[in-house]
Regions:
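Acidic/polar, glycine-enriched structural segments that form the non-catalytic walls/loops
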Residues: 1-135
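Substrate-binding groove/exosite segments of carbohydrate-active enzymes
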Residues: 84-195
Length: 195
């Protein structure tokens, strides 16, 4: 079975949101606003993804009360702390901008692919994608991702490895893939953990 992802979107500054065709929305803001040349306007919306349809209603209620300013402040603090840990590493590579830029891009990717525990995934781990057959944690990737996370997020690195050890077999092997529904866990290409 393929997991279905439900996207919950809430436009906080909108009065009305309508679908247009299969892939577009028309958003009518609560207040008319004449945008002057050279000026900008900010429209706030929240988007969250859930893997079970019944969770979508809970997510909608939760995102209605998000304190945006505090969320952005907390996120900036987390990002800056992680960035500082990585860029201040005692490495000759962190002295050259080309390598520093790559490190920042790697940090962005590691953060973007992180997923919290859900369903039969008991510890947070990274998904290469959240849709299709790759919507889960892959053992080969997990060990490498953990080795990157440990520089700025040691608890995330630990969680990445524990997600696979949750399914470790008696012979020491871990599944090649674990998913939201454990029926999809792939034992056919199992591997010894390289943690």
């Amino acid at each position: 079975p393929v997991d279905e992802v439900t996207a919950t979107v809430l436009f906080h500054t909108a009065d009305e949101v309508m679908t247009v065709g299969n892939d577009s929305l028309r958003v009518v803001e609560k207040s008319d606003y004449l945008l002057q040349s050279g000026k900008s306007y900010t429209s706030e919306y929240s988007q969250t993804l859930t893997l079970k349809g019944e969770e979508a209603d809970k997510e909608y209620v939760a995102i209605k009360s998000i304190p945006f300013d505090q969320c952005f402040a907390d996120n900036a603090q987390r990002w800056n702390q992680g960035l500082q840990r990585v860029l201040s590493a005692d490495s000759p590579y962190m002295k050259e901008n080309a390598y520093r830029n790559i490190a920042v891009k790697a940090l962005m990717t590691l953060n973007s692919n992180w997923r919290t525990p859900a369903g039969d995934i008991f510890h947070g781990c990274s998904f290469p994608s959240y849709i299709g057959f790759i919507g889960g944690c892959w053992s080969w990737d997990a060990w490498q991702i953990a080795s990157g996370n440990v520089y700025y997020n040691p608890e995330g690195a630990k969680s990445e490895m524990l997600s696979l050890f949750d399914y470790q077999a008696e012979n020491g092997m871990v599944p090649d893939f674990i998913g939201y529904n454990k029926v999809r866990n792939n034992w056919r290409d199992s591997k010894p953990p390289i943690a």
